[in-house]
Amino acid sequence: MALQQIVEQTVTGLGYDLVEIERSAGGLLRVTIDLPWQPPVEGGPVVPEQFVTVEDCEKITRQLQFALEVDGADYTRLEVSSPGIDRPLRHEQDFTRFVGEVIDLTLKEPIGAAAEGQVSANRKKFRGTLERAEDGGWQIVWSDEPPVKPGQKVSKKRVPAPLQALGFTLEELREARLAPIVDFKGRSAKPV
C-alpha cells in the first residue's frame, strides 16, 4: 500500500482530517492533521472552534508508527503536528471554512491583462480577505494602503485607497494559506 494511503486511512480512521504529508531530506515524514470541520447551523448555538492538541498528535503518532512499521515504510523520523497559524488551504471545504479570514494567495500565472492597469500585470501574490464571489467562485479583496502603525496619527483628510477584488478558481492557485496574523489578546468565537 502507498504511504499516502496508509497515512490517510490511519488519520481519518481516528476521526481527524489529513491536511498535508511532506517527506524531507534525512528521512523526515511530516504529517499535518486537523479536527474535522462542521459548518455552523443558522440559528444554532455558537460553538467555539476546536483545535488540535498535543494529545491528538500523540495519538496519531502512535498509530502511524504501528501502521508504517507493519507496511515497512521507509522513514527515519515521524512528526505529527497541527496546521498552525499559516494553515494551507487546498480544498473547497477549506475555503468555505475560512471565508472572511485574511489569506495569502499565490497564482500559478501572473494576472496579466486582467489587471486593467490597476495592479502590476506581473503580480502573482496577494494578501486580502477571502470572500465568496457572486458567480459561486472565490475572490480576494484587498487595499494597497499601507497599514496604520500603533501610535501613528492619521490625517482626517487622507483619502483611503480603494478596495480591489480578484476572482479566482482553485485550479488557478499555486498556493493559498491563512495569513499569520497574531493576536495576543486571546481567541474569541467567530460570529455566525
From Swiss-Prot:
- Membrane-spanning segments: none
User: Is the keyword Cytoplasm in the record?
Assistant: yes
Which GO biological-process labels does this protein carry?
ribosomal small subunit assembly; translation
Statement: the UniProt record of this protein carries the keyword Cytoplasm: yes
Q: Which Gene3D superfamilies match?
A: RimP-like superfamily, N-terminal
Q: Which UniProt keywords apply?
A: Cytoplasm, Ribosome biogenesis
- List the record's Gene Ontology CC terms alphabetically: cytosol
Q: What is its main location?
A: cytoplasm
What compartments host this protein? Cytoplasm
Q: Which family does it belong to?
A: Belongs to the RimP family.
Q: What does this protein do?
A: Required for maturation of 30S ribosomal subunits.
Q: Which PANTHER family match?
A: RIBOSOME MATURATION FACTOR RIMP
* Record protein name field: Ribosome maturation factor RimP
Q: Which organism is it from?
A: Delftia acidovorans (strain DSM 14801 / SPH-1)
Lineage at the top is: Bacteria, Pseudomonadati, Pseudomonadota, Betaproteobacteria, Burkholderiales
Q: Which gene encodes it?
A: rimP
